[in-house]
């Protein structure tokens, strides 16, 4: 029987893919260890049905902490140990300093002109300098202290108004709190359409999580349309662009001292100067970073900290005793009151170890061919550092899966990427530039929630019944919302 035209075309397409796959596979002489692969999709079948960071961690434990994965068209190195993280993020840091191009970056992030996705080069270096000296400096983060304190107090009042003994949706409340803090830091006021804005940010994060068909087959443009990804991202971008345009149009640049500048003030000042000229799209891309990278990560960290404390009553009691003893009945908490509270900081460190905000960090890309430990790595190979696996490596951490804040007592370990067994914000040139802001947005809200209220699970459930299931996405979120009952 003669083959139909459709079948012939489909068969020819499959044979073409198989040929390309076979010829590409033979081109690399010294290949890294890898699982068995299939034509066309490569190793994707090993990750189907898994949470990506856990699926990759399980493969690394079988095939090695430096392994290769073929994700569709994309050749990928996966690093899952402190040893290889240190080697690559120091010796080969500049070699892997680029970002892979993605459909999300192209459409949503204004052609990859934000801080996170910008390709390595002069523009990115200027952005990094802008973050270090202006947007995310310690001084600038400190300047937002009063608004953090005010919004945290508003949250406390809102929870009290809901009544003692009634369940509170902490997931919703915490996300709203962080979004409000960041919107005031960026624009000097809350966003009128904040609910719509935060929903758009959440949808962007959902679209960037995992391994999307558009990203594993970047050259197959028809798949971007067939999967509906391009249409979804275009729709998201149009809504987002309209919202940000309105916010910028409503904003009046202050003529006061730099210490009172909002983040948008800084960007508009630089946009109109020769110091570091920015386009309107550049400004919007950077503003998006402040929310996309800041809201979800900080709120998730607070949620996980509270979840772990509910699950571990001993640690919950210890941190609350420390807070209440230090504050001694004080009504409002100021940041100076909690800077030296050691156990609170241990709780945050341990939460970031078990639940790093970006478990696979942001992928990097090789800028040139390189020989790594005897293995030939082609140009444009993607690099994934599995921080989730590194932070739980049993060779470096005793009882690695257990929440034990005391493990950091008398330890010089910091969150800033100096110790490669603990990388909550990554390391090297492309390390998260917003670590200081993120920590400030975690510490004070967490202290307020723990100081003012005692918490328990609804319906008389015991502490060990809390659902700790993770969701699928760019950040490690709880799968279910955190509903707890306050008493005060």
UniProtKB/Swiss-Prot annotation:
GO terms for biological process: sesquiterpene biosynthetic process; terpenoid biosynthetic process. One of its GO terms (cellular component) is endoplasmic reticulum membrane. It is found in: Endoplasmic reticulum membrane. Pathway: Secondary metabolite biosynthesis; terpenoid biosynthesis. Heme binds at residue 432. InterPro entries: Cyt_P450, Cyt_P450_CS, Cyt_P450_E_grp-I, Cyt_P450_sf. Expressed in floral glandular trichomes. The keyword Translocase does not apply. Its main location: endoplasmic reticulum. GO terms for molecular function: germacrene A hydroxylase activity; heme binding; iron ion binding. It catalyses: (+)-(R)-germacrene A + 3 reduced [NADPH--hemoprotein reductase] + 3 O2 = germacra-1(10),4,11(13)-trien-12-oate + 3 oxidized [NADPH--hemoprotein reductase] + 4 H2O + 4 H(+). SUPFAM superfamilies: Cytochrome P450. Pfam families: p450. Glycans are attached at residues 169, 260, 379, 410. Keywords: Endoplasmic reticulum, Glycoprotein, Heme, Iron, Membrane, Metal-binding, Monooxygenase, Oxidoreductase, Signal-anchor, Transmembrane, Transmembrane helix. Belongs to the cytochrome P450 family. This is Germacrene A hydroxylase. The lineage of its organism: Eukaryota, Viridiplantae, Streptophyta, Embryophyta, Tracheophyta.
């Amino acid at each position: 029987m003669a083959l139909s035209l459709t079948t012939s075309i489909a068969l020819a397409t499959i044979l073409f893919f198989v040929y390309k796959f076979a010829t590409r596979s033979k081109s690399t002489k010294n290949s890294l260890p890898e699982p068995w692969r299939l034509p066309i999709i490569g190793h994707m079948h090993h990750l189907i049905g898994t949470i990506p960071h856990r699926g990759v961690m399980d493969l690394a434990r079988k095939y090695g902490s430096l392994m290769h994965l073929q994700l569709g068209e994309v050749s990928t190195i996966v690093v899952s140990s402190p040893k290889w993280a240190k080697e690559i993020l120091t010796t080969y840091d500049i070699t892997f300093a680029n970002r892979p191009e993605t459909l999300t970056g192209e459409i949503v992030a204004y052609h990859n002109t934000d801080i996170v996705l910008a390709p390595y080069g002069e523009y990115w270096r200027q952005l990094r300098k802008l973050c270090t000296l202006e947007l995310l400096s310690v001084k600038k983060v400190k300047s937002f202290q009063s608004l953090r304190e005010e919004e945290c107090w508003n949250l406390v009042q809102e929870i009290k108004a809901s009544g003692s003994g009634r369940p509170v949706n902490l997931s919703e409340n915490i996300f709203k709190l962080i979004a409000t803090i960041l919107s005031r830091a960026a624009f000097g006021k809350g966003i009128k359409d904040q609910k719509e804005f935060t929903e758009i940010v959440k949808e962007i994060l959902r679209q960037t999580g995992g391994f999307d068909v558009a990203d594993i087959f970047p050259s197959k443009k028809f798949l971007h349309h067939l999967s509906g990804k391009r249409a979804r991202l275009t729709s998201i971008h149009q809504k987002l662009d309209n919202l940000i345009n309105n916010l910028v149009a409503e904003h009046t640049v202050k003529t006061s001292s730099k210490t009172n500048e909002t983040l948008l003030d800084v960007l508009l000042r630089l946009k109109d100067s020769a110091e570091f000229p920015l386009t309107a799209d550049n400004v919007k891309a950077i503003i998006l970073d402040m929310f996309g990278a800041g809201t979800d990560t900080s709120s998730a960290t607070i949620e996980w900290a509270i979840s772990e404390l509910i699950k571990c009553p001993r640690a919950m009691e210890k941190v609350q005793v420390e807070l209440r003893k230090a504050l001694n009945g004080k009504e409002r908490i100021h940041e100076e009151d909690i800077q030296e509270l050691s156990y609170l900081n241990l709780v945050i460190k341990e939460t970031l170890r078990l639940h790093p905000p970006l478990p696979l960090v942001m992928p990097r890309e090789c800028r040139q061919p390189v020989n790594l430990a005897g293995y030939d790595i082609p140009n444009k190979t993607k690099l994934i550092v599995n921080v989730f696996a590194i932070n739980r490596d049993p060779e470096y951490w005793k009882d690695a899966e257990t929440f034990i804040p005391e493990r950091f007592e008398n330890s010089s370990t910091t969150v800033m990427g100096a110790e490669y067994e603990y990388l909550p914000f990554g390391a090297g040139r492309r390390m998260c530039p917003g670590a200081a802001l993120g920590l400030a947005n975690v510490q004070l809200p967490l202290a307020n929630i723990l100081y003012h209220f005692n918490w328990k699970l609804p319906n008389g459930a015991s502490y060990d019944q809390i659902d700790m299931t993770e969701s699928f996405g760019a950040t490690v979120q709880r799968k279910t919302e955190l509903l707890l009952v306050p008493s005060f």
